[in-house]
Amino acid sequence: MMANHLVKPDNRNCKRPRELESPVPDSPQLSSLGKSDSSFSEISGLFYKDEALEKDLNDVSKEINLMLSTYAKLLSERAAVDASYIDEIDELFKEANAIENFLIQKREFLRQRFTVIANTLHR
């Protein structure tokens, strides 16, 4: 192992003092050996959390998809009801138009009839 050499900090171009910088270990292998047990448990815990989070996200995604499909079905049913109402209204307008035409013809027929009666009475 190499001994750590004390280096006098050069503050001319530095924005922060050297004490705040993290020390660089002499050997990355030695520094990671002490951490291996704790980092392994942290990593396995993270994997467990990631798996649990992914499961929760999948469950939420399924619920959202179910709600969206239910909403789409509801909108489709309402659109079908609206279309049937439009068809009924169209039929009512056709029937009203037929009745109006019948009444116009009836009025014209009665007018002609009254004209004939009036002409007969005036003679």
Curated annotation (Swiss-Prot):
Q: Name one GO biological process term.
A: meiotic DNA repair synthesis
Q: Which tissues express it? A: Testis specific.
Q: Where is the composition biased (Basic and acidic residues)?
A: 7-21
Entry GO CC: central element; chromosome
InterPro entries, alphabetically? Answer: TEX12 (IPR029193)
Q: Does the entry feature the keyword Lyase, yes or no?
A: no
Protein name per Swiss-Prot or TrEMBL: Testis-expressed protein 12
